[in-house]
Structure formats: structure tokens, C-alpha cells
């Protein structure tokens, strides 16, 4: 890739001991931005602790293209105020980049405008699934030109709403994208999922929870069916949690090195899949300690393979695959329920298999996942495929395999700005007695 140099992943032969603070949740930030935009007719909304990354800045840019104002505080760029009116200029164009949330959450908003809005993005984004969402909007009476990027939404100022059947087995974002705008449709919205099980279901639960927080009535009592009643979306203050999925590479450093890493600001109760993350880490012999405002993982001196269904948390698959590849030699791990990752930023299953095998590991694709047999690996180039989670997986492996060079580490800016510096700080700020402190013993548990 022109202009992109490889990043020498730092290695350590000793346990990692560190305290890390990760920025806000991308998923929660972009949902809050969308809900604040839809609530602008009711008043201004404030978002505190917002993630500022490529994906969230693309969302901000998209909403500004649609006529909204998203203003950052002079003192804190993570403190945002959303106001204004949905009034895109003629021939407005939204850049989706490689952000699935922009690609799938913003077209329904554009349909509520009175202009034609064109959507495009990075070259890799053109292969990401979008047809189920566009077909769903067409069922609701929206005029759309195209079946993939670039496409144009011809807004008329209103969307009638009603019932739509879609196959969301390729991405939960098809459901979330429609749900977020559904209350603004004249008759509200009923979504019926018709395909295989929906992946990343906790993300739909996050959408429903945030809609309810904004005063929207949502009925999700029946499996694979969601009903959003028509009505105002309330302007309010949103407080964004730390991004727990982005904490996993740092917690993985504790697992693979036998050290202890503490994440500050870990929520006591979360709308993210916190419990699933902790179960995975415990399954890799990590000891989990929770306090009132942190989470700490203590790695063991050794750990074996794991058999885990990642359907609900597919975004964790690259990190889990990296930990599996570094397990005790001969250990076998099975990562299941992640066939949908073939349609993410890249085909993550093929990418993980290629990269792990390329440095001497053993990784085989299955119909819905990966089988990884831990073997001694060697240094080499780890390609990121412009995928932030592939890049962080390479960093995890590099901790224990000297000579790993990650191609295009800058792609981590998609959701985790300054990742290389955060990673270096983690390794540079060793704290050997984390587990001995009084706060670390507040609420021990697994």
C-alpha cells in the first residue's frame, strides 16, 4: 500500500502489568449521534465522553451533510452538542468511509429529508452488505437508486412506515438502522426478521435500550420481531461508556503474558456485552477482578484452548483468535457462529487464517468459524486488510512473537485513536503490584 509503512509490534518476555483507559464506545456514540439528530426538532442534545475516531467523525460529517450541527466543546472534543434541522443541501453526498454504522444508520434519516442524498465510501465498503436495508426502505415507500455503494436516497420529507420483512442474518445493523428512525415514520415501524439467527444481538439490545432512554416505545417481546411506535424522539444528555470491545486487546495482553491489566472506568452495569467478554477471558484461564470503577484481568502462567460461540460478539473474534494462537502448544480452539464476519471490513475468517498460517501457526476455516491449533510461530508481516481489529490482533501476537510487523497500524484510528501510543504506554508503564492494592481486592470473582 502506497504511503503505509509497517509497525514493529513490541514484544515482551515478561508479564505485562499496567492500567489502561480506553475511549468511549463507538457503537454507543454513533447511536447517540443518530438519536440526537432525530431529536433535534425537540431541542439540543449533549453527548459526554463521545469517541472521536474515524468512524464517529464520519457519522458527525454525515449528520452535518444532512443539515444538523454537531459542535464540540472548546475544552473537550468528546463533549458534543447536536442541534439544528434536517435540511441537506441539493446534491448532498455522504461519505460512509468504511463505517458500517454510517452506511446503515444514515439512509433512513436521509429518507426523512426533502432532498436526494447520495451515499458512497471507501472501495472496501462497496463490498459490504447493504441490500436488505435498502430493500426494506423500498418496502416502506422510499425511492432509492442503486443496490450498493454508491446509491441515492430520494427523500420526500416523510416516510409512511408500516411493516417490513428483512433478512438480517448478515448484520444486526440492518435492524438497528431501521429501528433508530422508526419512531419518526408516520405509522411507526414493525420489523420482522425472516432469515437465520441475527448475529451481534447485543447491539440490537443496545439500540432498543437507547431508544427507550429517548422516550420511544419499543416492543421486542416476540423473537425476531420489533415494533416501534410513532412519536417524538426526546432530546437529552447522553453519557458514553468506555468501549469494552476495544479494551479486549489490552486485557488480552494480560492473558498471553501472565500479567495483570486493569481497565479504568469499567461500568458496573453496561449496555455492552460485558458479561460475555468476561466469560471469554475466564475461559482462557484469566482471573477477573471487578471493582466499583475498574476491571482487572490476571493472566495465568499457561492456558489451553477455548471452544466458544462468538455470534453475539463477532467483533472480538480477531482478539480471541490471537489469544488462541498463543495458547499452550497443541491446544485446540474452536471459534463458532461467526460466518457473518466474511462480510465485515474484510473477510475476517480468511484474513485470520491467512495471517496466522503465514507466521507458522495453524488456523483452518470452517463453515461458521475457525479451528486454531496453537503452534510455535515466527516473525513476519501481519497484514491488516484496512481492518482495525485485524491490526490489533497482530499487536497481541507480537507481544509474544518477536519480529511481527503490522501493516497499516493506522487503520486502528477507525475506532481506537492513538492505539500505537496506548499500546506503548501499556508496556512502558509497568505496575507490578496491581493485584496487591486494596481496591483490586474489593470484589474478587470469576
From Swiss-Prot:
Alphabetical list of SUPFAM superfamilies matching this protein: EPT/RTPC-like
Chief location category: cytoplasm
Subcellular location: Cytoplasm
Nucleus among keywords: no
Pathway(s) served: Metabolic intermediate biosynthesis; chorismate biosynthesis; chorismate from D-erythrose 4-phosphate and phosphoenolpyruvate: step 6/7
Positions of 3-phosphoshikimate binding: 26-27, 31, 171-173, 200, 315, 344
GO cellular component, one term: cytoplasm
EC number: 2.5.1.19
Keyword Oxidoreductase attached: no
Keywords: Amino-acid biosynthesis, Aromatic amino acid biosynthesis, Cytoplasm, Transferase
Swiss-Prot/TrEMBL catalytic activity: 3-phosphoshikimate + phosphoenolpyruvate = 5-O-(1-carboxyvinyl)-3-phosphoshikimate + phosphate
Molecular function GO labels: 3-phosphoshikimate 1-carboxyvinyltransferase activity
Spans traversing the lipid bilayer: none
A biological process term (GO) from this entry: chorismate biosynthetic process
Subunit structure: Monomer.
Record family assignment: Belongs to the EPSP synthase family.
Purpose: Catalyzes the transfer of the enolpyruvyl moiety of phosphoenolpyruvate (PEP) to the 5-hydroxyl of shikimate-3-phosphate (S3P) to produce enolpyruvyl shikimate-3-phosphate and inorganic phosphate.
Name listed for the protein in its UniProt record: 3-phosphoshikimate 1-carboxyvinyltransferase
Source taxonomy: Bacteria, Bacillati, Actinomycetota, Actinomycetes, Mycobacteriales
The encoding gene: aroA
